[in-house]
Amino acid sequence: MSDRIRVRYAPSPTGYLHIGNARTALFNYLYAKHYNGDFVIRIEDTDKKRNLEDGETSQFDNLKWLGLDWDESVDKDNGYGPYRQSERQHIYQPLIDQLLAEDKAYKCYMTEEELEAEREAQIARGEMPRYGGQHAHLTEEQRQQFEAEGRQPSIRFRVPQNQTYSFDDMVKGNISFDSNGIGDWVIVKKDGIPTYNFAVAIDDHYMEISDVIRGDDHISNTPKQIMIYEAFGWEPPRFGHMSLIVNEERKKLSKRDGQILQFIEQYRDLGYLPEALFNFIALLGWSPEGEEEIFSKEEFIKIFDEKRLSKSPAFFDKQKLAWVNNQYMKQKDTETVFQLALPHLIKANLIPEVPSEEDLSWGRKLIALYQKEMSYAGEIVPLSEMFFKEMPALGEEEQQVINGEQVPELMTHLFSKLEALEPFEAAEIKKTIKEVQKETGIKGKQLFMPIRVAVTGQMHGPELPNTIEVLGKEKVLNRLKQYK
């Protein structure tokens, strides 16, 4: 193994980029970049039945969107390819043959039904299910008999007995497994395709992967992979297993959990910013020194320290994600946020599909009103409902404000001045409200609150003159006149 840091993210194209997998990719990326190493993407595509047609493309597209630029993969061969497992059979086969020749592996002809019956019997006896080794020492005659029956063999690794497999995990510390608790396991399925634990160990060795950083659901795979390294006399990589991501009930994040959006694609569609999602995911199971929580990608690369990866489960806090994205939204120029929000405004029929310059100008003003409040671009639709829907029935507090003694006088003056106002723009509207204040003597909350309630139906909201401009003269006058 070389001294250079080389890590890999190895997705299967059986689904879209999940938050958990994105975190695995991100921590591998930060680790590699912090040490000036290589971030490799390898595609584990041997499960042909489950592979999605656009699964691979989607993985790459979303990784690129997040800012996780890879150094090697199917599109950037650096001499360690092929980068798809399905194209590496020529690498696996000689090694399979070697294990068979050295009696470190053997052919097993047991049927699925026989294996299932064994498993059920073990569970009924209260035992941990494991292969009992029935075909570990077949004679040549027995093998020929099974093949004459048309049985297709799998190939099993012969697990050494009474051996302890230990590794120093960069997150969890020392972890040990007793080989007697692990049955002889399948390295090649009946269809000739190598299994995950066999192929991944071979690939990591030949690609000179120095560190394997992944979720702690892979801990139980590690001894099997170490067995393969030892069988060939290779040095294993360093391992690091990150803690689980949990939901509000502190249960493992499940793809069936409808309370949390779990795919990067969904956040893109809602109008989240990639740098905000990067920032949020980087804090799922890792923490910097100090209290600061907003960092650029470059800052994360500089400060990343694998020793600060947490052993405790990482809580997926939806409110925290909204807050982080809002911090980035506030820093963006209005045009960037408007372009992110425009598809949402069009989809909600709030702006025509082919907008005029006037429509676009109005949309930019709407975004300027709400940019500081927006948690994501798509939120502009629910935030700005008052611009498109009929006035809601007033609540008790709003009703109290609008029933104030001075309200009819205030509304009469304001209606008259706004009706004559040209251009109907925020700066002029602000002046007009000041004139009404002077003429009526009504000021402070008694002035602003009734106007806000009358035109928006709400007690709070963005800058009042800007809100009135965006609502437009006709709508504002219609809403004011009922309180004159």
Swiss-Prot record:
A motif ('KMSKS' region) lies at residues 252-256. Disulfide bonds: none annotated. Pfam families: Anticodon_2 (PF19269), tRNA-synt_1c (PF00749). It comes from the Bacteria. It is found in: Cytoplasm. Its EC number is 6.1.1.17. One of its GO terms (cellular component) is cytosol. It catalyses: tRNA(Glu) + L-glutamate + ATP = L-glutamyl-tRNA(Glu) + AMP + diphosphate. The keyword Protein biosynthesis applies. Keywords: Aminoacyl-tRNA synthetase, ATP-binding, Cytoplasm, Ligase, Nucleotide-binding, Protein biosynthesis. ATP binds at K255. It is an enzyme of class 6 (ligase). Signal peptide: none annotated. A motif ('HIGH' region) lies at residues 11-21. GO terms for biological process: glutamyl-tRNA aminoacylation. One of its GO terms (molecular function) is ATP binding. Catalyzes the attachment of glutamate to tRNA(Glu) in a two-step reaction: glutamate is first activated by ATP to form Glu-AMP and then transferred to the acceptor end of tRNA(Glu). PANTHER family: GLUTAMATE--TRNA LIGASE, GLUTAMATE--TRNA LIGASE, MITOCHONDRIAL-RELATED. NCBIfam families: gltX_bact (TIGR00464). Belongs to the class-I aminoacyl-tRNA synthetase family. Glutamate--tRNA ligase type 1 subfamily. Monomer. This is Glutamate--tRNA ligase. It comes from Staphylococcus aureus (strain MRSA252). The lineage of its organism: Bacteria, Bacillati, Bacillota, Bacilli, Bacillales. The gene is gltX.
